[in-house]
Amino acid sequence: MASHSSVSYRSVRTGGTSAMIGSSGYGGSSSSRAMGLGMGAAGLSMGGGSFRVGSAGIGGMGISSGIGGMGISSRAGGMSAYGGAASGGAGGFVSGGVPMLGYGGGAGGFIGGVSPGIMASPAFTAGRAITSAGMSGVVGTLGPAGGMVPSLVSRDEVKNILGTLNQRLASYVDKVRQLTIENETMEEELKNLTGGVPMSPDSTVNLENVETQVTEMLTEVSNLTLERVRLEIDVDHLRATADEIKSKYEFELGVRMQLETDIANMKRDLEAANDMRVDLDSKFNFLTEELTFQRKTQMEELNTLKQQFGRLGPVQTSVIELDNVKSVNLTDALNVMREEYQQVVTKNVQEAETYCKMQIDQIQGISTQTTEQISILDKEINTLEKELQPLNVEYQRLLTTYQTLGDRLTDLQNRESIDLVQFQNTYTRYEQEIEGNQVDLQRQLVTYQQLLDVKTALDAEIATYKKLLEGQELMVRTAMADDFAHATVVRSGTLGGASSSSVGYGASSTTLGAISGGYSTGGGASYSAGAGGASYSAGAGGASYGVGGGYSGGSSAMMEGSSSGGHSMYSSSSMKRSSSKSASASAGGYGTSGHDSTIILQQ
């Protein structure tokens, strides 16, 4: 019966994460009654690690005596195997509440069992023993296995697992799409900031010189800030001095205004005193003239009376004699009248003179007081004028100082404005230079990171090829051990993904299976080989697991994946043993950063 082998992969490129879904083929057999059937599984890889869900198959029916292959009778049910590996020593996977072991590197992975009541094959026992050793090396001689294994996982559980993985994959894809959109937005913003300048390295820019320039600029900015503070302090001092001088000027101006007011009042008093003096002088002159006129009038009247009485006396002399006892002496009467009149005139003259003297003395006293007051006022005016002269000089000096300080303050303000504009321009220019230097530095960092990624990818690819060559040598050495009934496997663990090996056991008593070996790194290369009648292949570090069926012989598969080199390569080569047909194989890929995976399968 012809063997059939098919492997299908779907690669999803999602901006730095690659996910693969693999399915197993149909197992072959060496007789017409043996057939293997593989069920599709899924594989997922993301970031720097890997996670695989290997193929699940239902083995064919063996015709051997119960030792080889699946160790069951001709009518026994098949088996299923689930394998996987998580790079970096991740934990196992639990499906349907049943913990599964695996062949993978590190402590991760899982493997399912066969259906209840089926004896585990030596290859399965060896794979489980190797897996349980974790990252440690295993040295041992394998023999027939015994004991029971966990029950077969049902189709519903497989569907649930695949549904869960598909949901996780969809969530990862959505997240990656969102991150892609955000990345495009950030690229647009960066393009707007850089003005469309490509992020290419600038060999002419020296970061040390840039840092030195930035330090010098910051120092200059600090010095300018200190200078500005000093100028502000000087301006404040000048303003305080100007305010003090202004207050003094206002005080002196108030004193001057008060003095001018007092002088004006004194001038008004002096004018009033002068007017009073003139009035009193005029009154004095009027009274003097009136006194003179009264004297003159009285003298004229007196002279007239004297003339009258004197003319009558000598001219008319008559003696009248009366014969009366009571005769009247007219001369005596006239003399008496004259004396009385003279007394009255004298009294009036004296009263008039006394009154005039009193008025004159009063006027003279008032005039003297006024004169004294005028003299005092003149002295005070002279004193105030003398005091006002230095005040005027001080006022002129303060006014000149105020104008000078005002001009200086204006000059300082203009200079400060000019310096501030220059400082702002310098600061803006320095900020632009710093931003440009930051953009150049970011561009150089991006270029450096790209080169570092390329270097890491190349190193990982070189390491992968080295391990591939080591795996091929191991396959050649193990192929020479087909005449032995038992196989000894020695592998040592390595960091990041460790190494693992599995063996296959013969399908019959006359034909032994070839030893299958595996090797894994932390998400890097992996090799798996399956051999024997109804053996399973074991993989590590993200490899796959297949189930084969047949009478004798088998095939070996070699698979390798690289996680950091920018691509993944999977290859499979078969080694025919005896008259066997090739068994099925499936592989789960390991993702790379933004690149699709390439699958190569050879029979």
UniProtKB/Swiss-Prot annotation:
PROSITE patterns: IF_ROD_1 (PS00226), IF_ROD_2 (PS51842). Keywords: Coiled coil, Intermediate filament, Secreted. It comes from the Eukaryota. Pfam families: Filament. Residues 193-227 are annotated as: Coil 1A. Residues 562-587 have a biased composition (Low complexity). InterPro entries: IF_conserved, IF_rod_dom, Keratin_I. SUPFAM superfamilies: Intermediate filament protein, coiled coil region. Its main location: secreted. Residues 1-191 are annotated as: Head. The keyword rRNA processing does not apply. Released extracellularly into seawater and provides physical and biological defense against invasive organism by modulation of the viscoelastic properties of mucus. Coiled-coil heterodimer of an alpha and a gamma subunit. Assemble into 10 nm filaments. Forms a massive, conical, intermediate filament biopolymer of approximately 60 cm. This is Thread biopolymer filament subunit gamma. The lineage of its organism: Eukaryota, Metazoa, Chordata, Craniata, Vertebrata.
